[in-house]
């Protein structure tokens, strides 16, 4: 089995848990995911099956989330899973004030990941250090936020803002919620998170575990072809050159430099190659299917 699964991750499971469950359902050992989702989050979790795990690095890295941010509350994890650090009324907040604060979170920004996160400091993950009671400050990281759109606003003691955020890899929506609360002086935490787009996969096309299991049992499950989500240009090779590519040999090509999807003339996906100075160098060669 080779290809991708657009999994609809349920709440309450880690991304690692999801990989394990897919292994059991599909009867595969080689399974990987294309970007961690917090246990409380739901939505798109790209899954690579078999040798397609070698292609995860080449998938598009933009992500889109729908998030609900609750004001007047801060927690140890920057979401509702953590212990409460502070509470106050946020009924004085107006949507217009919140809206004016959002542009500072756009573009290339410095962001501090949550204390409970998978970021490593001196070889240890922050969530392990936090559970040990160690007070470690996460290092600042540069991330990209392309767009923030307000979807809904509910005023009150714990005012809530629903937004859609398009961002690059490594962006923590929990950190945006926390930092927005600090800017507005009320504190805030992430109340709900759904990833609607990741690695080129959309939520509307995702499969639940239940649907996946039904399809596997019925023999109707078919992984998505690599080219479904890869966005690099396609280079078609004639039979002799395709064979040489599969042997790992460099090939002269009169094309612009860059990463390419490599296909044969029957449009069978062979792998990924990079053209540098007129030479195609195989980067990933997949086994014949």
UniProtKB/Swiss-Prot annotation:
Q: Which family does it belong to?
A: Belongs to the pseudouridine synthase TruB family. Type 1 subfamily.
Q: Does the keyword Acyltransferase apply?
A: no
Which InterPro entries does this UniProt record tie to the protein?
PsdUridine_synth_cat_dom_sf, PsdUridine_synth_N, PUA-like_sf, tRNA_psdUridine_synth_TruB, tRNA_sdUridine_synth_fam1_C, TruB_C
Biological-process GO terms, alphabetical? mRNA pseudouridine synthesis; tRNA pseudouridine synthesis
Name of this chain's protein: tRNA pseudouridine synthase B
Stored NCBIfam families: TruB (TIGR00431)
Q: EC number(s) in its UniProt entry? A: 5.4.99.25
Q: Which reaction does it catalyse?
A: uridine(55) in tRNA = pseudouridine(55) in tRNA
């Amino acid at each position: 089995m080779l290809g991708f699964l657009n999994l609809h991750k349920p709440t309450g499971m880690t991304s690692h848990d999801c990989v394990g469950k897919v292994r059991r359902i599909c009867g595969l050992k080689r399974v990987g995911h294309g970007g961690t989702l917090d246990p409380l989050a739901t939505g798109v979790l790209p899954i690579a099956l078999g040798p397609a795990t070698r292609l995860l690095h080449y998938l598009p890295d933009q992500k889109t989330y729908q998030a609900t941010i609750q004001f007047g509350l801060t927690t140890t994890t920057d979401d509702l899973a953590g212990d409460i650090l502070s509470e106050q009324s946020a009924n004085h907040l107006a949507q217009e004030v919140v809206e004016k604060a959002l542009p500072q979170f756009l573009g290339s920004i410095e962001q501090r990941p949550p204390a409970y996160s998978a970021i490593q400091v001196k070889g240890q993950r922050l969530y392990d250090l936090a559970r040990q009671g160690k007070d470690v400050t996460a290092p600042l990281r540069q991330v990209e936020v392309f767009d923030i759109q307000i979807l809904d606003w509910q005023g009150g003691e714990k005012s809530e803002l629903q937004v859609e955020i398009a961002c690059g890899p490594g962006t923590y929506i929990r950190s945006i919620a926390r930092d927005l609360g600090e800017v507005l002086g009320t504190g805030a935490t992430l109340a709900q998170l759904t990833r609607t787009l990741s690695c080129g996969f959309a939520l509307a096309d995702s499969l639940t575990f239940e649907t996946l299991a039904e399809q596997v049992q019925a023999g109707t499950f078919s992984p998505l072809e690599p080219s479904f989500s890869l966005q690099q240009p396609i280079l078609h090779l004639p039979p002799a050159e395709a064979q040489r590519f599969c042997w790992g040999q460099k090939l002269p090509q009169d094309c612009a430099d860059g990463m390419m999807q490599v296909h044969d003339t029957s449009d069978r996906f062979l792998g990924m190659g990079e053209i540098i100075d007129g030479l195609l160098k195989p980067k990933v060669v997949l086994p014949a299917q």
